[in-house]
Amino acid sequence: MRSVLVWLMVLFGGVFAPTAPARGNIPDCHPAELFATDNTDPLFEMQADVTIAQNGASVTGSIPLDGVYWSDALQRSVYERSREFHLCGADGSSHTAADALRRQFNQETVLTFDYLPQHAPEEDAIIIVAPDVDINRFRDAFAADPAARNRLRGGSVTTTDRTLILVAGTGDLDVARRLVAEAGGSWEAAAISYGRREFVD
C-alpha cells in the first residue's frame, strides 16, 4: 500500500508541480539561496519544491549538503544533512518560502541569501564558496572557533565535490577567512558573492 501511495504522490507531483524556469527567462527573477535541514524522508526534496513554488519562488536546482550548525536551543554544534535550494522569484519570496518550510518541517531555523550587487543599500552579507574542504576537518575547526560559532552560526560542505559554503555578515570577513584556512581550504581559490542574509526562525 505504501509503495502505491508513494507512486501516486510522485505521479501527481509530476503533473501539478510547476516546472522551474531558467532564471534568464523571468522578468522579475530575483536569484537567492535557501538552506534547510534535509530530513530522512525520500520525498522531502519534492515536497519542499512544491512548498517553495506555492510561496512565490521557483526552484532551479538543489544540492545535498553535510551541515554543521550552532543551535541556540541546544547550545552546541549540530551535525546534520541539509540541502541548498537555488531560488528564482520576486523580491521577498525567499523569506515567505523559508518561513513556510520552517513551519511545515518543524525546523529551528532556515537560512536565506538573496543576491545583490556589491555596495547595494540592503547588502549585509557575503556567500563564500571554497573548493576541496573535508567535512570532518570543517566540523572540528568550527567547534574550536567561538567567534565562528557566534557570528557565522554554521556552514556546509557539498556531498558531491567537497565544496565549502559559508554565509557571513560583511563585518565578519576576517572570521570567515580564518575558518576557511582552519578547515584546510584556500582563500585564494574561494569565490565570493554579495547579498542579504536572513535567519528565519
Positions of PLM-derived features:
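Enriched - but not universal
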Residues: 10-11, 73, 190
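N-terminal low-complexity, Pro/Thr/Ser-rich intrinsically disordered segments
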Residues: 22-57, 61
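Poly-acidic low-complexity segments
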Residues: 134-136, 170, 186
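C-terminal region of N-terminal signal peptides and the immediate post-cleavage residues
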Residues: 2-32
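Extracellularly exposed regions in secreted/surface proteins, prominently low-complexity, repeat-rich
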Residues: 173-201
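Short glycine/threonine-rich beta-strand-turn micro-motifs
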Residues: 58-131, 147-178, 199
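Substrate-binding cleft of extracellular glycoside hydrolase catalytic domains
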Residues: 132-147
